[in-house]
Amino acid sequence: ILTGKLKCK
């Protein structure tokens, strides 16, 4: 999911 990538940033 995109949520994981957003949290990484």
UniProtKB/Swiss-Prot annotation:
GO cellular component, one term: extracellular region
Subcellular location: Secreted
Key words of the record: Secreted
Tissue/organ expression: Expressed by the venom gland.
Domain of life assignment: Eukaryota
Primary site of residence: secreted
Main function: In vivo, causes moderate edema formation and moderate pain, when injected in mice hind paws.
UniProt protein name: Cryptide TyPep-15
Species in which this protein is naturally found: Tityus serrulatus
Lineage of the organism: Eukaryota, Metazoa, Ecdysozoa, Arthropoda, Chelicerata
